[in-house]
Amino acid sequence: MIYLDNSATTYPKPVEVYGFMNDFYRDHGVSPGRSGFDAAIETGELVTETRKMLTKMFNGGDDYNRLTFSYNATDSLNIILQGMIEKGMHVITTMLEHNSVLRPLYTLEKKGICEVTYVPFDERGYVDPDDIKKAIKPNTRLVVCTHCSNVIGTVQPIAKIGKVCKENGLLFVVDGSQGAGAVEMDMQKFGVDVYIFTGHKCLMGPTGIGGSYVREGVTIKQTRFGGTGVRSAVPGHLEEYPYRLEAGTMNILGVAGLYAGVKWVLNNGIRNIHDAEMKLWKKLRDRLRMIEGVTVYCATSEEDQNPVLSFNIEGFNGGDVGTILDVDYDIACRTGLQCAPKVHEILGTIDLHGTVRLSLGPFNTMEDIDTAITAVEEIAALKGFQYKC
């Protein structure tokens, strides 16, 4: 199988991740922070070390305990948004967002708790920070923006948006589902108050683990309560971090895989991985643009771009193209709206049932890309389209 669905989850994982998870769970598959025997202590140390690595990667701050774990980015976004948004607030977000942002905000707005404004993106796929500024109202308190689009791969101007937020006294939450481990995140430099991450994408970990980093001075109301393993006589849930946003037995196997994945990313270098992927992406983009009947969306520059590409073939439903790629060429991709319907409203692809998305990862090869290009050429030829010489 040629796997080009890395925006959904990276696959395969590095062999080091599989090996570490297997060994760790066999030798240390116990609950951290609950007991004083050696395996429990060592498991707790792994959790702490993972918090430290991610805090440093995101440049969150001095307190690594403010790096908290959850099931995934969607889970953390629910925790953070429900914990930050109060009655009467106005929230600004963008048309680039995934449903992990859109649906919590929609639900809160429908309940009459907040008002939401959706800022569009331009023809290149980027949000203009001035549009964020123009959308500010007297009761605006929060801006929520994706780090990178999961549909078109554009890396948003987070530092410039963060500057707008700081100048206007707004809190800034960034959904780093597609950004963490793929591109730089410097929370302090970029003015980001909360950064959301998931483990199973560019951090090269397993599914079922994600989290957030909340900077000092940002208040998140508690929405989860239960066991913490410490100070059990206290009747209410603990308010200090990390316990404030964590409750119950942790997914320690997920943390172990995340630890190994992050180490692999750091050892290989975020920039090195990204540059290698973008070399493949550029060839894919350039060649697909030369096929008659093929529309490639955005993808105007290699700068501020992740190795993600969406396209359609005239005369085909995207789902049918995906099926042909799978059955005839053994290429795995994603079709449809990619859980980001407002992106497709602007692209004009709602009536086309979305796009065909090819998303590259660190283990793709030039041979994979050549096969994908040939496949799209041959599918387009079924409608009489030819390669533009």
Protein language model regions, located:
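Pyridoxal 5′-phosphate
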Residues: 1-389
